[in-house]
């Protein structure tokens, strides 16, 4: 069993995963001025709340898109596990066949998503990861990572609208009953939820055209939290929502870098006969 953290600009997703699957997941606000001791206390309390003795942890791994927080979080993990965390980046084995202009610029979160998706699902595929930004990763029929797109995330778009205008309020994010809003709150919610769903549907169609694939040939996966699940449920294309995708990818990468990938591999139940590009 290992301790795994996925660090975004807004949140830190923490979890324990092992041969038997995911033991727990938790989420913290990413606070840049916290010390390693404060994060160590947060992590330790989370382990205790979920009944996981820290002595049982064989290792730890971090995927981070916030470099200034890396040292503090690595120290926090080392304090509670006594082990040096594996930080995903250049030099860490992931097994991906990356075909973009500068592979070193590919975000660690996108690497983790792709590793997990290739282990669980059939290529060609699109992987949507919705957080501070909405990202898409495209894997072609040969299992190669060929690119994607990045757009502003739903929450940051709503926050920009509320802070940059005089009359638009901050609203809770949920799907209204109708696309046509009849008050300001419902209009904002419709734009956020149905507008994002429409963007995703439109990009799926365009990506399929560029790949020369029929839309039904694409496996479309999305990961994220409750809001992202709500959005994907409003899409017209069939989308697999996998909220354990990131943890599964972190587990696979950790195994690959221990020289024991084949002996402890946790295969996803929905995996089909994908090309093994490892």
Question: What is each PLM-predicted segment?
Answer:
Residues 1-24, 117, 123-145, 161, ...:
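Gly/Thr-rich phosphate-binding beta-strand-loop-beta motif of the actin/hexokinase/Hsp70
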Residues 1-88, 92, 265, 278:
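N-terminal glycine/serine-rich phosphate-binding loop of ATP-dependent small-molecule kinases
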Residues 31-38, 106-108, 113-122, 146-192, ...:
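Glycine-rich phosphate-binding loop plus the immediately following alpha-helix
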Residues 48-53, 208-214:
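Alpha-helix termini
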Residues 50-106, 142-149, 153-154, 182-193, ...:
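Short beta-strand-loop/turn "lid" adjacent to the catalytic site in phosphate-handling enzymes
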Residues 111, 166, 239-278:
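Glycine-rich phosphate-binding/hydrolytic loop that grips phosphoryl groups
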Residues 196-212:
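A short, acidic, amphipathic alpha-helical segment used as a generic capping/interface helix at domain edges
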């Amino acid at each position: 069993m290992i301790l795994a953290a996925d660090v975004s600009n807004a949140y830190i997703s923490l979890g324990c995963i092992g041969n038997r699957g995911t033991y727990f997941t938790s989420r913290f606000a990413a606070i840049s001025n916290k010390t390693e001791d404060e994060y160590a206390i947060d992590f330790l309390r989370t382990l205790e709340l979920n009944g996981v003795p820290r002595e049982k942890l064989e290792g730890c791994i971090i995927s981070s898109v916030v470099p200034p927080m890396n040292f503090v979080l690595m120290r926090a993990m080392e304090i509670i596990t006594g082990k040096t965390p594996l930080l995903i980046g250049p030099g860490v084995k992931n097994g991906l066949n990356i075909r973009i202009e500068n592979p070193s610029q590919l975000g660690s979160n996108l690497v983790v998503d792709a590793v997990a998706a290739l282990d669980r699902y059939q290529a060609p595929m699109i992987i949507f990861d919705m957080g501070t930004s909405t990202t898409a990763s495209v894997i072609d029929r040969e299992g190669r990572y060929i690119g994607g797109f990045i757009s502003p995330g739903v929450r940051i778009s709503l926050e920009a609208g509320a802070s940059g205008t005089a009359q638009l309020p901050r609203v809770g994010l949920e799907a209204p009953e109708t696309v046509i809003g009849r008050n300001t709150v419902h209009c904002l919610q419709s734009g956020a939820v149905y507008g994002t769903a429409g963007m995703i549907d439109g990009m799926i169609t365009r990506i399929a055209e560029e790949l020369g694939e029929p839309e039904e040939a694409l496996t479309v996966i999305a990961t994220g939290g409750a809001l992202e699940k709500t959005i994907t449920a409003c899409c017209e294309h069939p989308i697999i929502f996998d909220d354990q995708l990131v943890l599964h990818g972190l587990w696979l990468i950790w195994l690959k870098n221990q020289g024991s990938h084949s002996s402890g591999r946790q295969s996803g139940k929905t995996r089909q006969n994908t090309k093994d590009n490892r």
